[in-house]
Amino acid sequence: MKKILVVDDEKNITTLLRAFLEDTGRYQVRTENSGEAGYQTALQFHPDLILLDVMMGDLNGDGLADRIKNDPLLRKTPIVFLTGIVTKKEVEENDGVIGGYPYIAKPILVLRELLDCIEANIRKSG
């Protein structure tokens, strides 16, 4: 079973994503509602992939991604950003990658797209 960490400051989003991903029977999911808590959980949980909100209060997604990529224990962990600051069209025009990271635009309207993105990025990482 693959491990996924969801970090988003909106509790309703983490709750929804956790329920959806766990219901597939393929993922063990942990959630956090702040960047700092997400980093600490990543160190302990060793996720196979991190779903990460871009805009958060204490430590935004870019800052957390930088910390993860500079940490020897976590640097190979794939990150997929969840964001409401780009449109689905912008994500598609950039082949789902902006700033070097794959993105999923919120709201996530087609959950199958999320699963496909998760699986593709876990496969890429090894």
Residue positions per predicted region:
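Two-component/phosphorelay signaling modules centered on CheY-like receiver
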Residues: 11-30
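Helix N-cap/capping motif at the beta->alpha junctions
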Residues: 31-40, 61
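Active-site beta3 strand of CheY-like receiver
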Residues: 45-51, 56
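The feature encodes the CheY-like receiver
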Residues: 57-58, 66, 75, 87
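His-Asp phosphorelay/catalytic-motif detector in bacterial-type signaling
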Residues: 46-48, 73-78
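Conserved sequence signature across two-component system core domains
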Residues: 7-8, 32, 50
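Alpha4 helix (beta4-alpha4-beta5 surface) of REC/receiver domains from two-component response regulators
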Residues: 63, 86-120
